[in-house]
């Protein structure tokens, strides 16, 4: 019975080499005979083992010519959709070059010879199993049919020699669109040496089947011990505002973050995991003694951050500690160092440490958000600038530690690690050297008592030095007549708050100082500041004409005026200390108006708080 093959009538690859066997000969004998003929042809040197030419015992043809006819005239006994191929049938997926593959899936030494194939010896056959294309090329590229080699009878229909047969049937994905799901062609291979049933091992060419070929020799294959459901979900993010790294664990659709520097955990997201209501959650977090409120930044970083011990206690009480594993592990960094994502993790941690080192090299530390809040805990500074010679531990993989430990606030866990300034020798490969001091230590809680005291002392010393420099500077330059007019009298001084950096003239952090105002001259007497009081305020113009002509303003004078200058704003009680006359008032309005109107009207910060107070208009109008 001669019928057409279901394999799309010759649109395959032309790699079928079906030898017409004489009638009356069984399929097994025909296959053995064809294999013997091919073997003798290869050994005699007439035909190379992997060439694409014709050999005795194999009917070859072009793609649309003889191959198409061959499917009609060849001896295909099509009974119960089984096609018995009597010749040596090379693998259509492997492109016919099945001789270069050993029985165990690893490529053997290829036999190079004269190949009339347009792509040379075994050009695209290595991609056949991975992508499902026959011969790895387009379906209209005519590749000449090939000759079976001496070893091709062992596995005719193997995908790169890696047929994984389940029982007798082996399936592999044939995703070329010329072989539809309607062509379940069963080809009987004969004299198979490596299959269990060498007499007739069935191989299904179904497009629905799928085969994972383990025949890769270069690409690494990691066999994870844990199933997909049990794999760790630890990710990292760089919190640029805080200059630290955060470890994140996703549980029930909520991302819970843990800081790297002090191990504090986002309590808001933590309680969201257990499905707690907003009122109950906020009530619990409001009563926390040690907390930091973050209101700006990324969504998964906003919320109330609480200490590690308290977060672990809340997680255990609500039964979500297991769901958040490994968030509460002391050495959570060890879960990041998988060979797949090791370079990226190394780069992120190195960037975090470089940023933290830059913050330490910057003069003075700025407090983190929430440090000046109403919490009872000591404020957490953004960068701890006083690293001590604590114990530094290295990770088990030999990565050098760049961190140092500060403080000794021990509540069953170690103190907070802060990175020191790395030396050039230790930062030459910053992508691989990381801060691994959490590996052999417990969790950390922030302690900043010593550093806070030292910073307060430094600020006081700086304030005293600035006061002395200001007085010396103002004594060195005598006051002009205009400054004497704008200067108040040394009369009743109401305020006695200590001077701070906000009103230090010429300080780098003072945006209203003399260094930043071009209109100010000789010591930075800023025109426009006024005295703030809850009493009734009025203008006293006599002070501007009859004020004292001292060479330099005193400290109380600067406290009253805000920056050593005044526009004549006084209290009503000050009228007793200086004469007042209508002539002086008229003279003031005629002479002082242009000078005061041209002065800079700048909002000055108050002495007690950082809120901006009012601005003097300098118009001389009487305010009641």
From Swiss-Prot:
Q: Where is the composition biased (Basic and acidic residues)?
A: 571-587
A Gene Ontology annotation in the biological process aspect, one of them, is: conidium formation
Principal cellular location given in the protein's record: nucleus
- Record field: compositional bias (Polar residues): 369-391, 427-451
Which residue numbers delimit the HTH APSES-type domain?
233-339
Q: Basic residues bias: where?
A: 70-85
Keyword DNA-binding set for record: yes
Region of interest (Disordered), ranges: 1-24, 43-99, 352-456, 474-504, 538-624
Result of knocking out the encoding gene: Leads to filamentous growth and abolishes mating and gall induction. In culture, produces abundant thick-walled, highly pigmented cells resembling teliospores which are normally produced only in planta.
Question: Where is this protein localized, as stated in its record?
Answer: Nucleus
Q: List residues annotated as DNA-binding.
A: 267-288
The cross-references to PROSITE patterns, in alphabetical order and at most eight, read: HTH_APSES (PS51299)
Q: Keywords of this protein's UniProt record, alphabetized?
A: Conidiation, DNA-binding, Nucleus, Phosphoprotein, Sporulation, Transcription, Transcription regulation
Q: Which GO terms describe its cellular component?
A: nucleus
Comp. bias (Low complexity) = 43-62, 352-362, 392-426
Ranges of Gly residues composition bias in the record? 615-624
Query: What protein family does this chain belong to?
Result: Belongs to the EFG1/PHD1/stuA family.
What does the record give as the function of this protein?
A: Transcription factor that regulates asexual reproduction. Binds the StuA-response elements (StRE) with the consensus sequence 5'-(A/T)CGCG(T/A)N(A/C)-3' at the promoters of target genes. Regulates dimorphism, virulence, and the sporulation program. Required for mating, gall induction, and sporogenesis in maize tissue. Regulates expression of the filament-down-regulated gene UM00205 and the teliospore-specific gene ssp1.
Q: Please identify the protein, giving its name as recorded.
A: Cell pattern formation-associated protein ust1
Name of the gene: ust1
């Amino acid at each position: 019975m001669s019928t057409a093959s279901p394999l799309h009538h010759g649109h395959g690859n032309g790699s079928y080499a079906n030898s017409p066997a004489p009638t009356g000969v069984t399929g097994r004998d025909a296959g053995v005979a064809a294999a013997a003929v091919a073997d003798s042809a290869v050994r005699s040197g007439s035909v190379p083992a992997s060439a694409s030419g014709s050999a005795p015992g194999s009917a070859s043809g072009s793609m649309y010519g003889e191959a198409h006819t061959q499917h009609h005239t060849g001896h295909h006994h099509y009974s119960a959709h089984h096609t018995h191929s009597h010749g040596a049938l090379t693998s259509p997926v492997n492109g016919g070059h099945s001789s270069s593959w050993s029985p165990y899936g690893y490529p053997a030494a290829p036999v190079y010879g004269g190949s009339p194939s347009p792509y040379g010896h075994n050009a695209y056959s290595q991609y056949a199993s991975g992508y499902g294309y026959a011969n790895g090329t387009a379906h209209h590229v005519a590749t000449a049919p090939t000759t079976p080699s001496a070893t091709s009878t062992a596995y005719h229909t193997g995908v790169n020699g890696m047929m994984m047969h389940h029982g007798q049937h082996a399936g592999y994905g044939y995703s070329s669109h010329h072989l539809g799901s309607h062509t379940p062609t069963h080809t009987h291979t004969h004299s198979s040496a490596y299959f269990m049933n060498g007499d007739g091992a069935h191989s299904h060419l179904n497009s629905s089947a799928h085969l994972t070929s383990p025949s890769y020799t270069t690409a690494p294959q990691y066999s994870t011990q844990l199933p997909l459901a049990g794999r760790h979900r630890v990710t990292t993010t760089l919190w640029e505002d805080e200059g630290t790294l955060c470890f994140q664990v996703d549980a029930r659709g909520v991302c819970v973050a843990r800081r790297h520097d002090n191990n504090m955990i986002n309590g808001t997201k933590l309680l969201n995991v257990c499905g707690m209501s907003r009122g109950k959650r906020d009530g619990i977090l409001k009563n926390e003694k040690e907390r930091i409120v973050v209101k700006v930044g990324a969504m998964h970083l906003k919320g109330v951050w609480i200490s590690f011990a308290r977060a672990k206690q809340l997680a255990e009480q609500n039964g979500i500690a297991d769901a958040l594993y490994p968030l509460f592990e002391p050495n959570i960094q060890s879960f990041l160092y998988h060979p797949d994502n090791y370079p990226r993790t190394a780069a992120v941690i190195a960037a975090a440490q470089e940023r933290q080192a830059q913050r330490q090299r910057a003069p003075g530390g700025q407090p983190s958000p929430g440090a000046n809040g109403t919490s009872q805990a000591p404020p957490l500074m953004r960068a701890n600038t006083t690293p001590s010679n604590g114990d530094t531990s290295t990770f088990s993989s030999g990565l050098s530690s760049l961190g140092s430990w500060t403080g000794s606030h021990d509540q069953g866990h170690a103190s907070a690690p802060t990175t020191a300034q790395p030396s050039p020798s230790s930062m030459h490969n910053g992508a691989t050297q990381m801060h691994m001091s959490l590996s052999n230590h417990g969790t950390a809680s922030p302690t900043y008592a010593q550093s806070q005291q030292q910073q307060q002392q430094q600020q006081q010393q700086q304030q005293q030095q600035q006061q002395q420099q200001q007085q010396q500077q103002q004594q060195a330059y005598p006051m002009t007549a205009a400054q004497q007019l704008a200067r108040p009298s040394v009369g009743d001084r109401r305020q006695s708050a200590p001077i701070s950096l906000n009103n230090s003239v010429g300080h780098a952090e003072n945006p209203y100082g003399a260094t930043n105002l071009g209109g100010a001259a000789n010591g930075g007497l800023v025109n426009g500041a006024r005295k703030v009081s809850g009493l009734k305020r009025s203008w006293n113009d006599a002070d501007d004409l009859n004020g004292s002509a001292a060479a330099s303003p005193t400290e109380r004078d600067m406290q009253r005026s805000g920056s050593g200058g005044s526009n004549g704003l006084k209290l009503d009680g000050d009228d007793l200390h200086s004469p007042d006359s209508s002539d002086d008032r008229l003279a003031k309005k005629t002479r002082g108006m242009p000078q005061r109107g041209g002065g800079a009207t700048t909002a000055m910060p108050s002495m007690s708080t950082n809120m901006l107070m009012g601005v003097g208009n300098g118009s001389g109008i009487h305010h009641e």
